[in-house]
Amino acid sequence: MRLLSLLTFSLFAVIGLAPAAQAKDKLTIYTYDSFVSEWGPGPKVKENFEKECDCEVNFVASADGVALLNRLKLEGSKTAADIVLGLDTNLTTEARASGFFAPSGIDQTNVKVPGNFKDDIFVPYDYGYFAVVYDSEKLPNPPKSLKELVEGDPAQKIVLQDPRTATPGLGMLLWMKSVYGDEAGAAWQKLQKRVLTVTPGWSEAYGLFTKGEAPMVLSYTTSPAYHMVVEKTDRYKALAYPEGNYLQIELAAQTTTGAKNPLAKKFLAFMTGPGFQDLIPETNWMFPAGKTSKPLPAAFDALPKPEKTLLIPPYEVAKNRRLWVNEWLAATSR
């Protein structure tokens, strides 16, 4: 009995002297909801980076890219975000002016996007072209130009996204402004007759489209690749318009809070390499912006290629965004 007590005491003494398991370092990433969905890149990105960093990644999702910036502005210096992933070039001037973002400090040699966008704060991770995607079984003769979309049959509906919360919605706003200029308000009034509804983010809009609520949706030239690869169908198609298609380059950046976390810079560097970039074509269904270890899926060869790329300089977007949103509101509320 005495021996048992001694052994028991010795066992507890050893346990007491053993170091406690250390909690893993954490990285908090604000992004949009489709990125972290079960079919998006988020789960695999988390898995790949956690293996590399021996850390814990926590995603916090918002409706879309514009909503991300709005949220960060509300939280200010108290934000929990180390990284914001899901902004685009249309928001960089405004995001920089907020003072909540810090230089990336990483080598961006492998990053290549149309127009050779480079920035010391905002790092591209993918890009694509906004397009009208349509259901060829319900709409055998889709609008072949932006003009035809604006002036076509009101019975043929399209689902759009809100430019105040969603980067695709903002992209559509800038697409219309690029083509119609001072006549954009009048063009919006005409197009409004074809709009079934305006959603807060891309996911809601595309969900309505695939459920058959409307034969058209604002999405990307790359969206049909998902249906070709996953669903083995070419039913859904995208259109390259003669007026041009508006370019989106998606970006990530570390916050000033995140700059104090060594994992933030490490993640941005990881984001430009194959562990992240290989996932983009078949989970985010966009073109990769960094180094990959394999070619694009064959389905991408069948996608329409815009002959003309439209992109308004970020400083001009920042200067006029509120004015153009108000123009859209006035035109579509009549």
UniProtKB/Swiss-Prot annotation:
Taxonomy of the source species: Bacteria, Pseudomonadati, Pseudomonadota, Alphaproteobacteria, Hyphomicrobiales
Molecular function, one GO term: thiamine binding
Subcellular location, record wording: Periplasm
Gene name tied to this protein: thiB
The species this protein was found in: Brucella abortus (strain 2308)
Annotated protein name in UniProt: Thiamine-binding periplasmic protein
Functional note: Part of the ABC transporter complex ThiBPQ involved in thiamine import.
Family: Belongs to the bacterial solute-binding protein 1 family.
Keywords: Periplasm, Signal, Transport
UniProt-listed NCBIfam families: sfuA, thiB
